[in-house]
Design a protein with these regions (language model features):
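Active-site phosphate-binding strand-loop segment of PLP-dependent enzymes
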Residues: 124-239, 244-246, 251
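Conserved PLP-binding active-site segment in aminotransferase class I/II-type PLP enzymes
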Residues: 1-84, 88, 138, 144-145, ...
Length: 349
């Protein structure tokens, strides 16, 4: 009981709380009020305004992406990313068993089938070893039979591959792989990207939690053509609600921006639309919040890492608890701190 009380007192001291300690609290310590007031004063609060463009440009610069496109949620960003990657109804998508429902929902909107694979204990993200083993047992590469299957106005695929990966048992196309950088920790993304290239599978990174995290100095969400980020209130930086797609293909990014703004062709008075479009654009007032938050992102990441170091120091002498240790060549924003209990299964057996 004494150890339990000491731990509770320690946690309260870290956060300066006497009562309840929430899992996540957004911090507004910069220009948030000034930027929000500017939106209100100018009346540009909806999906058109300078903060939308500024946020996209600043995020592209920060992450090293060729282009960034904001959305109204991280789930929207994942949904749009999968459509742009060419995922269609009845396709299969490789993802990880330790996940969040948003990833599966985005697949379900399209009518695709998730294939759940194991995670690495070292990263809590998709295991390339499990992925390789599953592909060797269950998959084969052959001619892509789904190109041109839909009318152009209904097909969101951008740059379809001539060849595709297929499940030998179900006959379905395995179109994409969605690894998640769980808790902000980078997965073994280079190995996953190599497997995707070898098997003609599109890589769509779920970087919802990992803004500020890098692998070998490269920001998460930029190892494939498309990555998705979330700015929900529990993330390292927030826009209240929102998401973003990161693109390593400038042309694809421009296409995404067009599709997410109702696919409207610019014209002074006519309303012409060349595709089935989506109203997925982030409002200017949310982007204003994002601009201010991004200015302090490195400070917030440093704060999270400091708290993690204090936790590790406090628990280092507690038997049966292992803290997450960053694998070589990775830098995690430590969006969430997790522990593992190696003997837990034995204890409950």
């Amino acid at each position: 009981m004494a150890d339990y009380k000491n731990t509770i007192d320690f946690i309260k001291s870290v956060y300066g709380n006497k009562g309840f300690t929430p899992l996540a609290v957004p911090v507004f310590a910069g220009n948030e009020k000034a930027y929000l007031n500017e939106c209100i004063d100018t009346t540009f609060v909806s999906s058109v305004g300078k903060f939308v463009d500024r946020f996209e440009e600043n995020m592209a610069k920060y992450t090293g992406a060729k282009r960034a496109v904001v959305c109204v949620s991280g789930t929207n960003a994942l949904h749009m990313s999968l459509l742009l990657a060419g995922v269609k109804k009845d396709d299969e998508v490789l993802t990880q068993a330790l996940t969040f429902i948003a990833t599966c929902n985005a697949l379900s909107y399209i009518g695709a089938h998730p294939v759940f694979l194991d995670v690495d204990i070292s990263t809590m993200g998709l295991s390339p070893d499990a992925m390789k083993e599953w592909l060797q047992k269950n998959a084969e590469v052959r001619k892509n039979s789904r190109i041109g299957e839909l009318p152009k106005s209904q097909d969101f695929a951008f740059g379809e591959d001539e060849f595709a990966c297929y499940n030998k048992h179900t006959g379905r196309r395995i179109k994409a792989c969605v690894p998640m950088h769980s808790f902000g920790h980078p997965v073994r993304i280079e190995e996953i990207a190599t497997l995707c290239k070898e098997w003609h599978i599109e890589l769509v990174e779920d970087a919802a939690e990992s803004i500020g995290s890098t692998y070998k100095g490269q920001h998460t969400g930029t190892f494939g053509r498309i990555g998705a980020i979330s700015f929900n209130g529990n993330k390292t930086i927030t826009t209240g609600g929102g998401g973003m797609m990161l693109f390593m293909d400038e042309e694809l990014g421009a296409y995404a921006k067009h599709i997410t703004t109702q696919a409207k062709i610019p014209h002074r008075w006519e309303f012409r639309h060349d595709h089935i479009g989506f109203n997925y654009r982030m409002p200017n007032i949310n982007a204003a919040l994002g601009c201010a938050q991004l200015e302090n992102l490195d400070k917030y990441v440093a704060s999270k890492r400091k708290v993690a170091a204090e936790y590790i120091e406090h628990f280092k002498n507690v038997d049966g608890i292992d803290f997450f240790v960053e694998p070589e060549n990775t830098f995690s924003n430590l969006s969430l701190i997790h522990i593992s209990e190696p003997t837990r299964q034995e204890a409950i057996s």
